[in-house]
Amino acid sequence: MKTIHNATLVVFVALAASALVASGDKSTSAETGGPSAKARAYNHAKGNYMTAATVNLEKRDLVITRLFDAPVELVWKAWTDPDYVMRWWGPKGFTSPSCKIDFREGGKFVFHMRAPKEFQGGQDMYTSGVYKKIVPLKLIEFSQGLSDKDGNRIDPTTIGMPADFPGEIPSALAFKLVGNKTELTAIEYGWTVGHMRDMSEAGLGECLDKLAEALAKR
């Protein structure tokens, strides 16, 4: 199976809004026994916001850190402005025809990506979630999962995912200014099946590659 990114996001991505300036609705066209996902997010958010030195990660948490040659305001915008998200969302070869973002704590998002024709005939896939905590230019915590175009959760098996693919993943994005560049740390908490964590890591990595290309074009 080829890679499909559950996030982000991201969380959506999440996964996975330009509420950099103002909030509002903006749309275009584990291992068990460890701390809770919320507790881990707050642990990450201390001090430098999720730098490797302050992180106590569970074995199957997914963590990717990238340094982008762009100011933190622009990298933040790349995740919070629907038009900007559409420029890079999805793994290599995928496009993002639409994006809906209500960037505020408790607000919802729906990220849309379309597979290339050679992969599942150009199938449309959606990731939706809710923003849990926002620290401007520093931290975004959110839930994310596969959904329909309206943001309603779907059974992952209906789009070809394994039966044990998680319905929802707690996630976070941390932003840190490093000189004139921005360090971004993307985290997806509590993956319980290793190969699916690896699959999401590959997809998220390709998304961030495309983000770097979009940022280079400003």
Question: Residues of each region from the PLM?
Answer:
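Signal peptide processing junction and immediate N-terminal pro/mature segment
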Residues: 20-38
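Bacterial N-terminal signal peptides that target proteins for export
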Residues: 2-10
